[in-house]
Structure formats: C-alpha cells, structure tokens
Amino acid sequence: MATTDFIAAIELSSSKISGIAGKKNSDGSIQVLAYAREDASSFIHKGVIYNIDKTAQALTSITNKLENQLNNSIAKVYVGIGGQSLRTVKNAVSRTLDEEGIISQELVDSICDENLEVPLADMSILDVAPQEYKIDNTLQADPVGVAGQHIIGQFLNIVARASLKKNLEHSFEQAKVEIADLLIAPIALANAVLTENEMRSGCALVDFGADTTTISVYKNNILRYLSVLPLGGNTITRDITSLQMEEQDAEKLKLQYG
C-alpha cells in the first residue's frame, strides 16, 4: 500500500548523505517510514560539496530508495545545510525618529531588511537570528508598540561562503529533486535535542562529525553563537595512523577506546 502522508528530508555530511521520510502522529511523536543513506566521503569534505556529479548520483539513489520503501513518489524534500565556513556574524542597525513615537511593525521590518544588505564579501546570509532591540538604551525582545525615539536592532546573521549553498542547489537540480526548504542543520539539531529550559538557561551544543565539529550556543531561547571547526573524528583517526598504524585499525582503536 502506498504511503501518502509523509515529509521527506535529506542531510549531507562529510561521511554520508542521509535521507528519511516520516509523519507526525497526533501525540506529536515522529514515525519513521523510510530511511536510506549513501557514502559521501569521496565527494564531500568538511561538509562542502566538491563533486556535483557524484553528489547528484547519490541524491538520486537515496530518493529512489525512499520512494521504493514508501511505494510513492517524493515531490519535495527538506534539506539540512552545514559545513565549513558556516558561522555567525553580529550586526546592528540603528534608526532615529524625528520625535518620540510608537515603534511600528513597518519600522522593525525596515530595520530587518537593512540588516540583510550588510556587505559580506564572498559570504552570503543564509538565515538571521534576531537578538534584541535597544530602544532609548532599554533592551526589548519585542519592540513593536514601545514608545521611543532611538532604536537599535541587534542581529546574528548566519553566513557561509556563497559556494556552499550554490553547489548544494546545483546538486539537487542535477538530481531533479526539488528542495522544499533549506534548513540550517545545527539549528534543526538544537531544536530536536535541546529542551526549552536548556535554551533559556544557556547551553552549548557540540556536534562532533567526521570532518567538522559544530558549536552552537543558546541563551534566553535565542541562538547567540554558531561556528564550524574543521576538525572531526577523522582527524583523530589520522593522528593515530601517524603511529605506523593502518587507517582501518586506527578507526577501530578510536571507536573502542574513545
């Protein structure tokens, strides 16, 4: 019997490309309906796609496997984006009103739009995490409706090299797989594993991958910092091989003794 009520997602990493399809139950839990993966170590390094043709082939294979398990076609997939060069950059935009007035939604929208125009050389803004707004030296989480004459919007822009997103989109286009939406992988992970109390009280989430380690910091339910370090599990394996050990044995030793 064909499965019709589902959502599909694909995440690309240095070691593998994973695809999953599932549905949300009435109690809020997620039921996994299909799963597939392909090795990506030969064409994705530090989370960055270096061979679009091979990536497209892997995406096609994963999509076909998911469709076979679902006995249905997949129209669109949600895609997690991460990898080296992904990081956060702070920015502030200020406005001064002619006289004290009420901060409107239109003014806030205009400040948000101006933030997106900040020059970033070869980087592009993938998403924005608004921090706070300062109105006449008083911090406000929601400035709309507050009286004041001077407003500063503080933003945390999530940026990456333009090629990171471009190569990913080219790979999906070549595989003829339509992207429903691009999700920042570390943020999606944080939303899945961190509790509201942890995000509010303040915590750091460290995701240790094959070629990279991603650090995300939260405070007051807001992302405060994100960075991807070009070091991962494979780095440890390579260090062990320097002791005149084969890579396969080094990997086994690492996994066995941590």
Question: Model-found features: residue ranges?
Answer:
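A short helix-loop
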Residues: F208, S216, Q248-Q256
